[in-house]
Amino acid sequence: MSRHKSKSIPGRNLRLADQIQKDLAGIIQREIDMTRAGLITLSGVELSADYAHAKVYFTVLGAEPDTAAALLNEKAGWLHSQLYKLLHIHTVPTLRFVHDPQITRGIEMSVLIDRANRPGPHSGVPDEPEDQS
């Protein structure tokens, strides 16, 4: 006999990930003193297929990403318990905070592009011709 497979609800994973991101951002902003960790922005949540684990991606301004990750992961158990109070689901995922390097790379690329477009001898963009009148 074959076992009945449960079918996941389409889009549930994305909706739950978005809700976890919103709730965590609010909890962190209201309840945790993150002055040592700089300004933290949650950039996304990735859930495992069984909803048991969540990678929470963040960016940080004004501090080292490793310091912020250590502080957030130190608070992960408490944040999990706070999420349990807010989410009405059977299993609240365990949280693991991971620095999101894509935002930082995007900023670095933007700086490089701006620098390359700046007029000057080493920029690749010719200087403006001087008015000879």
Swiss-Prot record:
Transmembrane segments: none annotated. GO terms for cellular component: cytosol. One of its GO terms (biological process) is maturation of SSU-rRNA. It holds the Pfam family RBFA. InterPro entries: KH_dom-like_a/b, RbfA, RbfA_dom_sf. GO terms for molecular function: ribosomal small subunit binding. It comes from the Bacteria. It is found in: Cytoplasm. Keywords: Cytoplasm, Ribosome biogenesis. One of several proteins that assist in the late maturation steps of the functional core of the 30S ribosomal subunit. Associates with free 30S ribosomal subunits (but not with 30S subunits that are part of 70S ribosomes or polysomes). Required for efficient processing of 16S rRNA. May interact with the 5'-terminal helix region of 16S rRNA. PANTHER family: RIBOSOME-BINDING FACTOR A, CHLOROPLASTIC-RELATED (PTHR33515:SF1). Monomer. Binds 30S ribosomal subunits, but not 50S ribosomal subunits or 70S ribosomes. Belongs to the RbfA family. HAMAP family: RbfA. This is Ribosome-binding factor A. It comes from Bordetella pertussis (strain Tohama I / ATCC BAA-589 / NCTC 13251). The gene is rbfA.
